[in-house]
Regions:
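Acidic, metal-coordinating helix/loop segments flanking the phosphotransfer/catalytic sites
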Residues: 38-56
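Acidic catalytic/metal-coordinating carboxylates
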Residues: 40-41, 67-75
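The feature encodes the CheY-like receiver
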Residues: 22, 64
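Alpha4 helix (beta4-alpha4-beta5 surface) of REC/receiver domains from two-component response regulators
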Residues: 70, 90, 100-121, 126-131
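Non-catalytic signal-transmission and effector/linker regions of two-component phosphorelay proteins
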Residues: 1-11, 86-91, 125-139
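Active-site residues of response regulator receiver
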Residues: 60
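Conserved acidic carboxylate
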Residues: 16
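Charged docking surfaces used in two-component/phosphorelay signaling
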Residues: 23-31
Length: 139
């Protein structure tokens, strides 16, 4: 795929302790024209997070030191505080990457705030992954 003009200026943060897979995604998305930040330590991501810098945040669902949902809640709180302090209304999206088989029914019961589209499987081919990310940043 050649870089799409609508990916220019789209900033994505990937937070995942799976260095190999997250590096692969970073490469794929940069080839597609996205601006990427990759952080493999969720604590570093939390400490340095500024919601005004990103259009999409992809978080590893199961990381060894922090659960993806715990990190989501921390980033969401940071976002709310930044919006209050700066009167900003940056609209970014947080979604999850998982290598586990996804049980959407169980996830939607536990976390109704996320639709099925907010779960990205790590097992999909490059073209499917890229298409999914395009839909997340454009929708």
């Amino acid at each position: 795929m050649s870089p799409s003009s609508n990916t220019n200026n789209k900033n994505i943060l990937i937070v995942d302790d799976d260095v190999h897979t997250s590096s692969k995604y970073k490469k794929w998305l940069e080839e597609e024209g996205f601006n990427l930040t990759l952080i493999n330590d969720p604590y570093v991501a939390e400490q340095n997070f500024n919601p005004e810098n990103y259009d999409l945040v992809l978080i590893g669902f199961r990381m060894s030191i922090v659960d993806g949902f715990d990190l989501y809640h921390k980033l969401h709180e940071i976002s709310k505080k930044v919006q209050q302090d700066t009167s900003s209304s940056n609209d970014f999206r947080i979604c999850f990457m998982t290598s586990s088989r996804i049980n959407y029914n169980a996830l939607s019961e536990a976390h109704p705030e996320f639709g099925e589209e907010c779960y990205v499987s790590k097992e999909v081919p490059k073209d499917v992954f890229i298409k999914h990310v395009h839909s997340l940043v454009s929708g």
